[in-house]
Design a protein with these regions (language model features):
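Flexible internal linker/loop segments at domain or repeat junctions
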Residues: 225-226, 260-300
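Short, structured secondary-structure boundary patches
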Residues: 162-165, 182, 269-272, 277-283, ...
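An amphipathic, basic-hydrophobic helix/alpha-beta surface used to engage anionic
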Residues: 20-268, 308-312, 326
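Von Willebrand factor type A / integrin I
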Residues: 1-31, 56, 283, 287-370
Length: 370
């Protein structure tokens, strides 16, 4: 309008250039937005805590006009902060970027893009779009560490007792045909001579007492004065302590069970294998609203065949202390893992002393983020 009113050719030329640029920008964004494809892939869907994960993001479009580098708005997870990645290859129809991050915390998450921005090269138009899919699930598994093997209560049958019972020649449960690897002392010579084939004695296998692992899946208790970003480290320590105890029992060929409550309740048994437990622990959300004391109380009625109990928590209250002492008096050995950043807390010290007086084994676990 200014160019037309003043009759200046220079202004008219500038106006035409701006108008063409505006039309060019609109067409470039519109054509790219209609044909754009955004995909992402992870280097692995299951990784251990502490591993480095690579995410490859590919952006392509079939628009006939160039556009500005696409801006990728990354989704915030416990391992990836929210942020924006600007692709640097200006004008190319296919752009690729590799985003690396460390899996610092255990959990199940969907790292990737929350949205992306398509804009023209002049910056006139910007359109935000969301990807068609939420991306691949990343499962960060807990990493077990070395713990002391559990000791079972006196009078319980251990591995050596079971072996002796299995080798008692005076109490066979059945007789079967010989199999490769059977010891000679199990051969029933009289029965073998009668049947004219080698027969061996079969013995009943006495059941070993199992170990019970109780994990507190309520929101972890953070010591006063500590920043909120320390809470994920408490969750990691809880999960890895539970995985470590179970892994130790499996290596010792001792049965262990672990009831899990929360969004995915289940009764884990060592017969399921350690990988199943690691995946279930990785999906634990620590949003259980039921008090842990009630969970412990529900297990008191099932301690008849339990030789050892492990309790893993971040809080120590007077009711929980009384329940642990009561559990110890019922027979099994009890071990407590108290996960905390402050081991010398004056509020919990009297309760810990009470547990130790009742012959409860108390262990402190300091999270890795201390």
């Amino acid at each position: 309008l200014c160019a037309l009113s003043m009759g200046n050719r220079t202004y008219l030329l500038i106006s035409i250039i701006i108008a063409l640029a505006w039309v060019f920008s609109l067409l470039s964004v519109h054509s790219a937005e209609k044909t754009i494809q955004v995909s992402s892939g992870l280097s692995g869907q299951k990784v251990n805590r502490g591993d480095v994960v690579s995410m490859e993001i590919t952006v392509s479009h079939k628009g006939f006009l160039p556009i500005a580098p696409v801006a990728l708005h990354m989704r915030a997870t416990s391992n990836t902060p929210a942020g924006t990645i600007h692709l640097t290859q200006l004008g190319k129809r296919r752009q690729r970027v590799v985003h690396k991050f460390a899996a610092d915390h255990v959990g199940a998450m969907f790292p990737g893009m929350e949205s992306y921005t398509v804009s023209d090269v002049f910056g006139f138009f910007k359109h935000d779009r969301q990807p068609d899919t939420s991306g691949q699930e990343l499962l960060v598994l807990p990493v077990p560490f070395e713990v002391e093997p559990l000791t079972f209560a006196a009078g319980d049958m251990g591995v050596e007792t079971m072996k002796r019972a299995m080798e008692d020649p005076s109490s066979p449960a059945d007789i079967r045909a010989y199999q490769q690897g059977d010891p000679l002392k199990r051969i029933h010579w009289k029965m073998s001579a009668r049947k004219r084939e080698i027969m061996v004695r079969q013995f009943e296998e006495p059941a070993l007492p199992d170990a019970l692992v109780l994990l507190d899946t309520s929101p972890p208790l953070l010591s006063p004065g500590l920043p909120e970003d320390r809470r994920p480290f408490l969750c990691d320590a809880l999960l890895e302590t539970a995985a470590s105890v179970v892994a130790c029992q499996i290596r010792q060929d001792n049965p262990v069970r672990m009831p899990l409550v929360g969004d995915r309740p289940m009764e884990y048994s060592s017969r399921m294998g350690l990988p199943v437990l690691l995946e279930e622990l990785a999906r634990c959300t620590f949003n259980e609203t039921e008090q842990f004391e009630r969970v412990v109380m529900m297990q008191l009625a099932e301690l008849r065949k339990t030789g050892a109990v492990v309790i893993i928590t971040t809080r120590m209250t007077s009711p929980l202390c009384d329940l642990i002492v009561r559990m110890k008096r019922m027979g099994p050995n009890v071990r407590l893992y108290l996960v905390t950043f402050v081991a010398d807390d004056p509020e919990t010290a009297p309760l810990v002393a009470k547990l130790q007086q009742a012959a409860v084994e108390v262990n402190y676990v300091t999270p890795s983020g201390s």
